[in-house]
From Swiss-Prot:
Signal peptide: none annotated. Residues 22-40, 141-158 have a biased composition (Basic and acidic residues). Residues 1-158 are annotated as: Disordered. Keywords: Coiled coil. PANTHER family: PROTEIN FAM204A. Residues 100-112 have a biased composition (Basic residues). Disulfide bonds: none annotated. This is Protein FAM204A. It comes from Mus musculus (Mouse). The keyword Amino-acid biosynthesis does not apply. Residues 122-132 have a biased composition (Polar residues). The gene is Fam204a. The lineage of its organism: Eukaryota, Metazoa, Chordata, Craniata, Vertebrata.
Amino acid sequence: MWSGLLPPGLNESDVESDSEDEIKLENPEPSEHNLQEDGKTGSSTKPAVSDFPTGQPETETEADADAYEKCPSGIPLNIWNKFQELHKKNSEQKNSTPRFRQKKRKRSKKGKLKNEKESHSEQSSNETQWEELTQYFGANDRFEPPVKQKKVEKSGLEKRIDQAVEEWDVEKAEELSNQLATRELGVKIAKAIACHKFVKAKKEAENSQAARKKKKLAWGFEAKKRWETKSNMGYM
């Protein structure tokens, strides 16, 4: 409304119609074209997630929303989270298995070296024992009578060997001869062990006797005192 008088050529009805037009222009009705434009501009003007400050912690609703975005449709959220945890544990175990394998390999190498050392030490000890026994092979042969004077009776195994040779059964004769050789070697080893034990016991007895002689006094107390008095009398 105009204050005071109206301009020439205008009535109050004209002024009211102009004011209504101005109101319509200020607040126009939304059309379809305007709605589409508003939708485009609104989508572009929506604040993105990165526009928010990063220092603030996310709320539960935002975390749930992110989880639901990652979770496929038709699967509950708790099952999806459990699946993710299991997947993470599986990947960690796969990454940690090569270390355990390397440790096992190192342990197996150490065990092999230890077994080799033990076998080598056992072999060396067996060799030393065998060398000690071989020294006594045939040690008592000189006490046996000569072969001409000795009556030799064949054993059952020797008779079977002779029978196999007469029958031209070479394989059987070889097998029986091997058995005879092992038997003779066993007899030699048994005699060598007995001789070794005898020598060892004899040495121990000699050593103990020598130790007793060392411990025994050269003279008694009275003889020593008498000798001391005689030596003192010479200086008087």
